[in-house]
């Protein structure tokens, strides 16, 4: 398996839309708003002609937010390759940090990002509860591993410190 990561092209959009729908992340609730993940730019991972991963991102002033990151097969390096691509992109855009929001039940994501240098930056207590009540009532009460889904966690990677450290 040879994974290639590249910026998505217009002709990739239909496949990205299907991929995000399959991972139930075409529209995501975070920080009190719904965001259509099909609209921002994306990095894609391909194995030959097969789409095996998508990372969508948004820039804010001097930071790059990882909006979504999903792969077809975990534990094969695809997510790491996409995240490394986003890090290179963020540096080329002169971003000082990368950040993302995940939920309190997503222990796999917490492990993944922390092992790649991200740290817990902020807790948004009750954010998922508020999103469920006001934005998307289909957000489940119970998430991964039977954990009650309540809070959003913000993780960040300071790019300046990485370059000097």
Give short role names for the model-derived ranges:
Residues 114-122:
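Conserved acetyl-CoA-binding loop of GNAT-fold acetyltransferases
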Residues 30-32, 138-146:
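Short, P/G- and charge-enriched loop/turn segments at secondary-structure junctions
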């Amino acid at each position: 398996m040879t994974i290639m990561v590249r910026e998505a092209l217009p002709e990739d959009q239909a496949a990205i839309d299907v991929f995000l729908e399959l991972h139930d992340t075409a529209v995501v609730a975070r920080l009190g708003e719904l965001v259509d993940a099909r609209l921002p730019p994306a990095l894609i991972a391909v194995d030959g002609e097969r789409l095996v991963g998508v990372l969508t991102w948004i820039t804010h002033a001097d930071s790059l937010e990882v909006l979504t990151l999903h792969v077809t097969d975990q534990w094969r390096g695809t997510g790491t390759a996409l995240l490394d691509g986003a890090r290179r992109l963020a540096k080329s855009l002169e971003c000082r940090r990368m950040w993302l929001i995940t939920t309190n039940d997503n222990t796999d994501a917490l492990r993944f990002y922390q092992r790649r240098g991200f740290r817990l930056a902020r807790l948004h207590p009750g954010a998922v509860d508020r999103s469920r009540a006001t934005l998307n009532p289909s957000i489940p009460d119970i998430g991964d591993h039977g954990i009650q889904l309540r809070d959003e966690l913000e993780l960040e990677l300071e790019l300046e410190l990485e370059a000097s450290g």
